[in-house]
Amino acid sequence: WLMIVEQKCRVIVMLAKCFEAGKKKCQKYWSDSKETKKFGRVKVFNAEEVKYCGFLRRKFLIESVDEGITMKVFQYQYINWPDHCVPNTTSNLVRMHKYVIQCFEETGSDAPMVV
């Protein structure tokens, strides 16, 4: 989260689920919906979670104690990628890509996107 704050990143893209076939694949680095979780000196509030066909969009409010700033960060998580394989169709992934690009452009930020 320190990197997100330092670079003022507004969009995160995640292509994996935290668990697949009972095995941990990724550390969950965010709070549950409508909850705040502290990561060091950064607070992450999961303000909104919307499920689309094949992916989730989360809106986080990030507060940096050190920087004294609060910022909105959007996370897109593709949830239909099968373990050790490829999706049967690309339509949901392409749809998510369009949402990501639109969101990135709407932020008006020149900060990098985190993938």
From Swiss-Prot:
<keyword id="KW-0378">Hydrolase</keyword>
<dbReference type="Pfam" id="PF00102">
    <property type="entry name" value="Y_phosphatase"/>
</dbReference>
<feature type="binding site">
    <location>
        <position position="83"/>
    </location>
    <ligand>
        <name>substrate</name>
    </ligand>
</feature>
<comment type="similarity">
    <text>Belongs to the protein-tyrosine phosphatase family.</text>
</comment>
<dbReference type="InterPro" id="IPR029021">
    <property type="entry name" value="Prot-tyrosine_phosphatase-like"/>
</dbReference>
<dbReference type="InterPro" id="IPR050348">
    <property type="entry name" value="Protein-Tyr_Phosphatase"/>
</dbReference>
<dbReference type="InterPro" id="IPR000242">
    <property type="entry name" value="PTP_cat"/>
</dbReference>
<dbReference type="GO" id="GO:0004725">
    <property type="term" value="F:protein tyrosine phosphatase activity"/>
</dbReference>
<protein>
    <recommendedName>
        <fullName>Tyrosine-protein phosphatase 19</fullName>
        <ecNumber>3.1.3.48</ecNumber>
    </recommendedName>
</protein>
<feature type="domain" description="Tyrosine-protein phosphatase">
    <location>
        <begin position="1"/>
        <end position="115"/>
    </location>
</feature>
<keyword id="KW-0904">Protein phosphatase</keyword>
